[in-house]
């Protein structure tokens, strides 16, 4: 059985992020590394770095097999696009805010209020002063 093992090193702030990928073959006799290759992404974006960090959980010396599985839907829908979260659609409010039961996750109330005010202000015609 062949596995692809991905080891990510260089997760400190400005270290280049290096991904070592190894094809590991598991037989009855034991495990054997068939080939390794390295892809170096210098100064990868923090998002990628954070993702890989949570993926490998401080991989410095350990080798951990990261199963290649399709990304699951995010737990909460992130603004726009409507019900992308795992919330049943019946309970979902506007696409802007994902509602779980009664708890709303989304833009803060302040921002919403501000937007409402702006909308109200725009509608009134400007009276010319002359």
UniProtKB/Swiss-Prot annotation:
Q: Where is this region: Disordered?
A: 61-130
GO-annotated cellular components = nucleolus
Nucleus as UniProt keyword: yes
Q: Where is the composition biased (Basic residues)?
A: 109-130
Q: Where in the cell is it found?
A: Nucleus, Nucleolus
Note in the entry:
MINAS-60 is the product of an alternative open reading frame (alt-ORF) of transcripts coding for the RBM10 (AC Q99KG3) protein. MINAS-60 and RBM10 ORFs are overlapping and are formed by shifting the reading frame.
What is this protein's record name? Ribosome biogenesis inhibitor MINAS-60
């Amino acid at each position: 059985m062949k596995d692809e093992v991905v080891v990510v090193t260089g997760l400190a702030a400005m270290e280049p992020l290096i991904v070592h990928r190894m094809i590991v073959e598991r037989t009855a006799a034991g495990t054997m590394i068939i080939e390794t290759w390295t892809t170096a992404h210098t100064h990868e974006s923090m998002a990628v770095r954070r993702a890989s960090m949570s993926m490998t959980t401080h991989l410095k010396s350990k080798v951990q097999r990261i199963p290649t599985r399709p990304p699951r839907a995010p737990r909460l829908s992130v603004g726009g696009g409507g019900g992308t979260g795992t919330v049943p659609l019946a309970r979902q409010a506007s696409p802007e805010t994902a509602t779980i039961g009664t708890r709303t996750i989304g833009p803060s109330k302040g921002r919403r209020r501000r937007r409402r005010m702006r909308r109200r202000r725009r509608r009134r015609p400007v009276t010319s002063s002359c």
